[in-house]
């Protein structure tokens, strides 16, 4: 199926997902890429992001260079903590509170440890309002769409002032790690292996080695010509036969 965002053209896939998953049958999910957005596609079993099985547990670094992504050194500058929202209609958001409440929870927890500026950045297609006046040094700054692209935003520009990025499981965390910015994410995020798990260290975030992470990440996404050649399907089919069928 295409995506687990139960909205618009993708809404019809929810019935397929629930029918097969309720029978413990595997579902292959195709989702827009995060490494090369609008160029590549994630293809995994039984979900998206870290909830999916990409058959990439034991891979080398031979594929990463193909993406031509600069992995910048971890930086210890910046001042803003950027809290990124995501689409609440997505299966990824199940069991989570309304987005406004989630934002409040993140702000409250962060403020236990630091008074750094906090920027709330809602998902571009899932607007939300919260009362920032009850907090100190917190503001909402929505993403600006790049009209020259399908759905790119000004994330790269926003990250220039970032000290850290907070995200449940969406792609901005991945972009932040590429840019050398520490992230705070949930276990559902593809950035979890190089992310921070608690705000207790927000003033001195962990900055782990990223080589193994990029190796695994490179086997989550594929170009259309590779899909036409059957390269990802060959890997996924093998995994299905070994583990799910």
PLM segments and residue spans:
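Secretory-pathway glycan-assembly enzymes, especially type II membrane glycosyltransferases
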Residues: 1-67
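Active-site regions of enzymes building and remodeling cell-envelope glycoconjugates
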Residues: 1-3, 24-28, 41-47, 81, ...
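Well-ordered, non-membrane alpha-helical segments in soluble/globular domains
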Residues: 10-15, 97-109
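A donor-sugar binding/catalytic signature common to diverse glycosyltransferases
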Residues: 150-197
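Catalytic donor nucleotide-activated moiety binding site of glycosyltransferases and closely related
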Residues: 107-149
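Leloir-type glycosyltransferase catalytic cores
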Residues: 41-78, 193-245
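Short loop/turn segments at strand-loop or loop-helix junctions that form parts
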Residues: 1-7, 31-34, 78-90, 122-124, ...
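Surface-exposed cleft-lining segments at the edges of enzyme active sites
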Residues: 88-99
């Amino acid at each position: 199926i295409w995506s687990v965002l139960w909205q618009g053209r993708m809404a019809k896939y929810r019935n397929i997902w629930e029918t097969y998953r309720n029978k413990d049958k595997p579902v292959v999910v195709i989702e827009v890429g995060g490494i090369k957005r609008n160029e590549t596609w994630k293809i995994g079993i039984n979900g998206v992001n870290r909830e999916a099985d990409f058959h990439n547990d034991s891979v080398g670094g031979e594929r990463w260079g193909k993406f031509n992504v600069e992995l910048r050194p971890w930086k210890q500058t910046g001042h803003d903590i950027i809290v990124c929202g995501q689409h609440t209609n997505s299966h990824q958001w199940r069991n989570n509170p309304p987005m406004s409440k989630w934002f409040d929870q993140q702000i409250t927890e962060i403020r236990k440890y630091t008074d750094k500026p906090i920027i709330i950045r809602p998902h571009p297609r899932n607007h939300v309002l919260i009362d920032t006046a009850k907090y100190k040094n917190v503001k909402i700054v929505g993403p600006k769409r790049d009209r020259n692209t399908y759905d790119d935003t000004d994330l790269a520009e926003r990250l220039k002032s970032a000290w850290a990025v907070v995200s449940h499981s969406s792609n901005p965390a991945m972009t932040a790690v590429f840019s050398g910015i520490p992230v705070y994410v949930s276990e559902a995020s593809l950035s979890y292996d190089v992310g921070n798990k608690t705000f207790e260290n927000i003033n001195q975030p962990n900055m782990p080695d990223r080589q193994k992470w990029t190796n695994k990440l490179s086997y989550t996404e594929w170009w259309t010509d590779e899909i036409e050649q059957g390269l990802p399907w060959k890997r996924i089919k093998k995994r299905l036969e070994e583990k799910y069928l």
